[in-house]
Amino acid sequence: MTDPQNPAQDSAMTAPVTLPTDLVADAVEAYDRYRYALENGLLIQNSWHQELDGRQLACALGVLGGAVNGPNDCPAQIMPRWLARMVPGFFDRMAPADAQAWGLALYEQLARLKGQVPFSVVYDWQATAVLEFWAGSLQRRKFDPETLATKLAQVETLRALHRKHLEGGAAPRDAWCEALRPIYAYADADAYADADADADAYAYADADAYAYADADAYADADADAYADADAEPTPRAEGETRADLKARRKAENIKLLGDGLVAALARAPAPQA
């Protein structure tokens, strides 16, 4: 019921819940903003911002502010550029409920780290999630024993380099090239090797672009094999086509890799007070 004696109060009561459009100041505020969006049904996928019935909606990065329309607009104090570039690929490709839960877990870790995310997270993620996933996918396929052993050995060689960097060591460019070429069939091994052998932050940003692209290719290749029933028995829901099955498997793979990234963030030490 309206209150003619207090129109301002009535207006406040009927105003739609919406997202603030001002830019968040730090990673803790970013977590609070994302949680607010989640709790009030203001998150969307595959679009940066959207207005609906007077409400401002946004994606996992768009919630940071109305001016955030791409990874390059993400403030550095929230997360590094290389991580911002990865977020849409995970958030937009998971099932909605999985994406929303993943985003909350991501921002929780960013708040804990105060936005100071070391690049070692990528080495951790590659060694413990991406390459582990790919090794498992290879083992489910119909390779002859010798071919499978060769492929798994190549995965282990590359994983050892990631672990070496994670533990504070370093490997020369040639070592990265030799390990990457047989594994990263979908990425530019030379460019990735240059970045991994270089301590420059901009090179690292480029390296991550290749790392994510290849992780996505692995997820897609595994989904293809799954949909073709080449690797294992593949139950389909009633009326589900091969394309449907592949899309479902791809979303599951992306979730697995995205969860692995959050787990790697959780293992990164918090900055000193």
Regions found by a protein language model. Give the residues of each.
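Short, glycine-biased loop/turn motifs at secondary-structure junctions and
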Residues: M1-A273
